[in-house]
Amino acid sequence: MWIDCRTIARSIEERTKERVEKLGFTPKLVSVACTDDPSALSYLKSQRKKAEKLGIAFEILNVSPEEIVSTLKKLGSDESVNGVFVARPFPPSFDEKEILSSVPVEKDVEGVNPANLGLLLYDEEIFPPCTAEAAVRILERETNLSGKRVTVVGRSVTVGKPLALMLLKKGRDATVTVCHSRTVNLEEITKNSDIVVVAVGRAHFLKKNMVKEGAIVIDVGINYVDGKLQGDVDPSVEEIARVTPVPGGVGQVTTALLFEHVVRAAERQRK
Ligand code: NDP
C-alpha cells in the first residue's frame, strides 16, 4: 500500500497559510545559491512556486564561492529576512561545515547549522532538518513509534544521523538501528524491523525480500535514472508493506515543512 503523503503535505501547507495570515506581515525566505547542480536549481524553482502559493516572499541570491559565508552572515542581521536556505550540494572544494555554521541559527529553517543539529542530542528541536522531520511526521501519522524497531539505512548528517536522534527522542521512544555501506547482513536487520527508512541514494536499493510483511517503509531517495525520478525502494515492496511513493512522498512533506519553519521563525522574530 502506498502512504498518502500528499494529504500530509497539504495539511501542513494549509496551517502554514493560516499562520501567515495571522502574522500581520509577509514573512520572507532567502535561498542562497552557489551551484549549477540541476536538482538544486529545480528545488529552488519549486520553492518559488510554493512560496507564492503560501503568501511568503522569496528571493534567490546567486553568489560566488568567495561571497557565500559573508552573505549568510549579513542575512543574519537583515530584519526583512526570516528564513535562510542554502542550496546544496556544494562543489567539493567547499568547507561545508564552515558554510553551514554561517547560516544564522534563528533563521536556519532547514536545520543545517551544527548548532541546531547539536540540539537534537538534547531532545530539542527548534529547526530539525526538514527531511528527517518529514520522515518523523509521516511515521507519526501511520503508527505509534514507541518501542518500534526502526532501521535507518544511511548515516549522513543531512538525513540518517539526525533522523536516528529524532526517533530516539524521549516520548517517541523508537528503538533505532543505523546502517551504512559497511553494515554486515543488512537484509537480516531490515527484515526484522517494523519500520525501515532508506536514505542511500541508489535506485530501487531496498527489495521486497529485505522487508517484513506489514512493515512501514519510508523512501527518502531521489535518483534520476534515464531522466526519470526513482526512489531507493523497489516498487514491489509496496505489495507487502506501507511505502511512501517517489515522487510525491517525503520530498513534498520536506518542502511543506521548510515553509512551516519560515513562519515559525517569523513568529519568533516578531516576539
Ligand atoms: P549520502 O550520500 O550523504 O549518504 C548515503 C548513505 O547511504 C551513507 O551513509 C552510505 O554509507 C549509505 N550507503 C551507501 N551504499 C550503501 C549500501 N550498499 N548499503 C547500506 N548503506 C549504504 O546521501 P544523503 O543522506 O544526503 O541522501 C540519501 C538520498 O536521499 C539521496 O538519494 C538524496 O538525493 C535523497 N535526499 C532526499 C531528500 C528529500 O527531501 N526527499 C533530502 C535529502 C536527500 P557510508 O556512510 O558508509 O558511505
From Swiss-Prot:
Statement: the UniProt record of this protein carries the keyword Hydrolase: yes
InterPro entries listed in its UniProt record: Aminoacid_DH-like_N_sf, NAD(P)-bd_dom_sf, THF_DH/CycHdrlase, THF_DH/CycHdrlase_cat_dom, THF_DH/CycHdrlase_NAD-bd_dom
Chain sites annotated for binding NADP(+): G154, R155, S156, S181, I222
Gene3D superfamilies according to UniProt: Leucine Dehydrogenase, chain A, domain 1, NAD(P)-binding Rossmann-like Domain
UniProt-recorded Gene Ontology molecular function terms: methenyltetrahydrofolate cyclohydrolase activity; methylenetetrahydrofolate dehydrogenase (NADP+) activity
EC number(s) from the headed UniProt entry: 1.5.1.5, 3.5.4.9
One GO CC annotation: cytosol
Pfam families: THF_DHG_CYH, THF_DHG_CYH_C
Reaction(s) catalysed (UniProt annotation): (6R)-5,10-methylene-5,6,7,8-tetrahydrofolate + NADP(+) = (6R)-5,10-methenyltetrahydrofolate + NADPH; (6R)-5,10-methenyltetrahydrofolate + H2O = (6R)-10-formyltetrahydrofolate + H(+)
Glycoprotein keyword on record: no
GO biological process: L-histidine biosynthetic process; methionine biosynthetic process; purine nucleotide biosynthetic process; tetrahydrofolate interconversion
Record pathway: One-carbon metabolism; tetrahydrofolate interconversion
SUPFAM superfamilies recorded: Aminoacid dehydrogenase-like, N-terminal domain, NAD(P)-binding Rossmann-fold domains
Keywords: Amino-acid biosynthesis, Histidine biosynthesis, Hydrolase, Methionine biosynthesis, Multifunctional enzyme, NADP, One-carbon metabolism, Oxidoreductase, Purine biosynthesis
Description of how the protein assembles with itself and partners: Homodimer.
Role: Catalyzes the oxidation of 5,10-methylenetetrahydrofolate to 5,10-methenyltetrahydrofolate and then the hydrolysis of 5,10-methenyltetrahydrofolate to 10-formyltetrahydrofolate.
Family note: Belongs to the tetrahydrofolate dehydrogenase/cyclohydrolase family.
Protein name listed in UniProt: Bifunctional protein FolD
Organism: Thermotoga sp. (strain RQ2)
Lineage, top ranks: Bacteria, Thermotogati, Thermotogota, Thermotogae, Thermotogales
